[in-house]
A protein has these predicted regions:
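Extreme N-terminal starter segment of soluble prokaryotic enzymes
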Residues: 1-4
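Two-component/phosphorelay signaling modules centered on CheY-like receiver
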Residues: 10-31
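CheY-like receiver
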Residues: 12, 37-126
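C-terminal output/effector regions of signal-responsive regulators
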Residues: 129-138
Length: 138
């Protein structure tokens, strides 16, 4: 199960994304935030695996927000502006959804995030179970 948050300053977009998330069994919505500043405390107090993130928001854009994070969860940009797509992918966005977002496109993005999430967890498990050789120095 992936824990996610939604960050968007548009109430209708928040509502739609919340509805979409509720339809996907392997997603657990931790919080909806109307701006990126609200999300900072959510990220500090919770293990978040995926962020649905608007770009154009007052005070702090989604791009500025992602750049400010030391540890970046997987993230999917959700925006009305297609001209940020290249920058989004340069920041390693899982996907870039242009509003209005059809459910089938949302689902495709979530499946892509789920695949990356599973691969990341497998690598972590392999690393944790790896028996490092002991070196003895004289």
């Amino acid at each position: 199960m992936m824990k996610c948050i939604i960050i968007d300053d548009e109430p209708l977009a928040l509502e739609l994304l919340e509805d979409f998330v509720s339809k996907i069994p392997n997603l657990k919505l931790v919080s909806c935030c109307s701006n990126a500043i609200e999300a900072v405390s959510i990220l500090q107090n919770n293990k978040i695996d995926l962020i649905f993130l608007d770009i154009e928001m007052p005070e702090f854009t989604g791009i500025e927000f992602i750049k400010s994070l030391d540890v970046k969860p997987l993230f999917i940009f959700t925006t009305a502006y297609s001209h940020y797509a290249i920058e989004g992918f340069n920041l390693n966005a899982v996907d870039y959804l242009v509003k209005p977002i059809p459910f089938h496109r949302f689902l495709k993005a979530v499946n892509r995030a789920q695949d990356l999430f599973v691969k990341k967890r497998r690598k972590l498990i392999i690393y944790q179970n790896f028996k490092f050789p002991k070196f003895y120095f004289c």
